[in-house]
Amino acid sequence: MPGVTEDTLYQGRVKLFQPEKGFRASTDSLVLAAALPEKLNGSALEIGCGCGGALLTAAYRLSSMQLTGVDIDAGMTALASQSVTANGFQDRVNIETGNAAEWVRDKENQFDVVFANPPYFEPGRISAPGAEKAAAYLESLSLDGWIKAMAFAVKPRAPIVIIHRAAELARILSVLDRLTGEIRVLPIASKRDEEARRVLVRGRKGLKRGQVHLLSPLITHTEDGQPSARLAAIRQGDAIDW
């Protein structure tokens, strides 16, 4: 793949190969990895793992877990596999290429946690580098289908964790409400007085419906634009207590 960079996360402790342009690891990737409960054991699945930004940092944090990442883009999974080897995670992290909805068909109730960072764009409004691949994602699986695939693969009573656009929260909750319980929502805002643009959402499969818990927002930056203490801790590998 042309235009590949070799970067590091967690202050140099995790190596990551990723495209120079297009889908790259971001704060969203680190926040998603930090949102996974620290005491998890067993197996984890990331749907739409891309080049592995969230998957590899999750593997670093959750050292007793077996992790699988699946993505439709063979170029991205090749980079993720390269990063797995560079970090010495071959015994614990498996990368596969495929359409998530098809890939999970024989994986019902298999994973102890399933997490995802679904694409944020909308049809007809894609302008970032890698637009053709972005369009392929949209055609392959809707947001509703993405969440249903996650819920299908996770074990009963186990969590699914999503980071997505805050504007899609109602849609996310409408699907999760039918499939999960103990739903928690953590808004993510750049600054204290700004509107949240992202949300972390967690639900546990098969539990009874109940109140949705809306938490105080995670603020990523100070008023002068510097990383907040919480974001700095996440970048070091700390978990989010939510």
Predicted features along the sequence, with ranges:
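Mobile active-site "lid"/loop adjacent to the S-adenosyl-L-methionine
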Residues: 118-145, 149
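Conserved beta-strand segments of alpha/beta enzyme cores
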Residues: 15, 66, 92-94, 181-184
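Class I SAM-dependent transferase core
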Residues: 1-39
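Conserved Class I SAM-dependent methyltransferase catalytic core
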Residues: 21, 25, 141-196
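Residue-level signal for inorganic ion chemistry
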Residues: 32, 117, 146, 203
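SAM/dcSAM-binding transferase cores
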Residues: 195-242
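Conserved SAM/SAH cofactor-binding pocket of Class I
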Residues: 34-127
